[in-house]
Amino acid sequence: MGNTIVIANTNIYKLPFPFLPVTITRFADGEIRPFIECDVVGKKVIYVASMYPVPSDIILEWILTIDAVKRKGAASITAVVPYMPYIRQSKVHREGESRSAEIVSRILSTSGVDKIMTFDLHNESALSFFTVPVVHLSALVSLPSLVSCDAKTIVVSPDQGSAPRAKRASELLHAPFVVLMKKRSLVAGDTVEELDLHDDIAGKTAIIVDDIISTGTTIAKAVTLLKDHGCRKVIVYAVHAILSGNAKETLESTSIDQLIVTDTIVHTTDAYPEKTKVISVAPLLSNALQQNLA
């Protein structure tokens, strides 16, 4: 591993490799200019790129940075994208829309990277869009060490699309799972119109498992529904905390007992809702990198 270095804007995850920063400057008209000052000739480069908060800008920054690294003579480039944007747009729901997940995946694949690492894609079928190897990691494996389960614990999927993820979590926790029914507006994609539940959950501890919290509306309605049906406690575990708009206030307005998220997206402490616990994906990432770069 002595021939491996990490480059990034900031050293968020404190990985067990030498870290060297990327310098990003902008011209007066806003054009991006990355600069790689360090020596990368013949080295295995790990490029850690957060795609938050403006993924459209950061994707261009990614492309230019990868090109700069290749031009300096790196032996290989492994790109780490803890949260992969645009994957929610994996289908064309209405004529006139783009299949954005496929387009972005192809752009990233052809940027010059040799491998991509990411966590908990919203839709695993999007893996087929990439044309370079993708190491798809899951932060769900940390769940058993974070929550205590008993005979009255259930795992809840907030919608049908998240059911496979909730099922994996239920297997890890050795607990049954239920699925909430959800309808979403095609016009305002983040707006949940209704939820329904067909299981008896009175007196249970519910653990809602999802990959993303964006506006918080889905989770807030799910928490309220579960409490209205008699759940004694509701814990939410979500990998990617986007927390857009009024998500903090929306979640704080519910009777949620605990929110657990990871640092695939990093916020300041005051940006998180009350009762939030943030866990780091650094150990999982470090282990995966050492295995894949060996």
Write out the residue ranges for each language-model feature.
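PRPP-associated nucleotide enzymes
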Residues: 1-294
